[in-house]
């Protein structure tokens, strides 16, 4: 069982062995996404940082930056093939980073003008709160949900 919390500690509980491993990352943790291999964890933090962590020894394998996340919980994910880290941010953008190099591959911002909330309050910032990679490897898609109530489906 893995947990991340506002104290900035990634905790791994081994229920069978009765053990707890803790890795201190210093900034509040907002999202955890386990790798398919079971030995890595994508950790998102309020310091506008995503970290790919090695669960065996607690080392950081890669760091992803260039987005804004300082106040809200923005869920991040990895694509099905684990080639990209994807996440929204507090400016309403969707970002993707290469998981091996850590380089930003792209960022995009959808048109929120169709949202009822945006029409009522066009100057209120929109945060992309949830990002999820689609399960179909043949047609990779990403679904995002924003604070204005919109859901967008993105294709590569």
Task: Give the positions of each predicted feature.
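A surface-exposed beta-alpha-beta supersecondary segment
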Residues: 62-85
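Loop/turn segments within WD40 beta-propeller blades
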Residues: 33-39, 44, 77-83, 88, ...
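Conserved strand-to-loop turn within each blade of WD40 beta-propeller repeats
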Residues: 4-7, 44-47, 87-91, 145-148
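C-terminal transmembrane module of eukaryotic multi-pass membrane proteins
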Residues: 85-94, 99
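Active-site lining segments that contact anionic ligands and/or coordinate catalytic metals
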Residues: 38, 47, 71-73, 82, ...
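Blade-level signature of beta-propeller repeat domains, shared across WD40, Kelch, NHL, RCC1
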Residues: 127-156
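Per-blade loop-tip surfaces of WD-repeat and WD-like beta-propellers in eukaryotic adaptors/scaffolds
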Residues: 7-29, 52-62, 68, 96-114, ...
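Canonical WD40 repeat/beta-propeller blade segments in eukaryotic WD-repeat proteins
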Residues: 27-34, 70-77, 123-133
């Amino acid at each position: 069982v893995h947990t991340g919390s506002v104290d900035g500690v990634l905790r791994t509980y081994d229920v069978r062995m009765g053990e707890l491993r803790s890795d201190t990352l210093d900034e509040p943790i907002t999202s955890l996404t386990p790798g398919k291999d079971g030995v890595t964890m994508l950790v998102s933090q309020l310091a506008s940082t995503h970290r790919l962590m090695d669960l065996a020894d607690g080392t950081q394998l890669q760091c992803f930056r260039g987005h804004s996340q300082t106040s809200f919980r923005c869920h991040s994910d990895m694509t099905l093939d684990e080639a990209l880290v994807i996440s929204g941010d507090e400016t309403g953008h969707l970002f993707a980073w290469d998981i091996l190099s850590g380089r930003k591959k792209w960022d995009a911002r959808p048109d929120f003008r169709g949202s009822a909330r945006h029409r009522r309050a066009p100057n209120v910032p929109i945060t992309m709160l949830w990002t999820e990679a689609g399960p179909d490897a043949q047609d990779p898609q990403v679904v995002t949900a924003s604070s204005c109530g919109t859901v967008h489906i993105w294709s590569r």
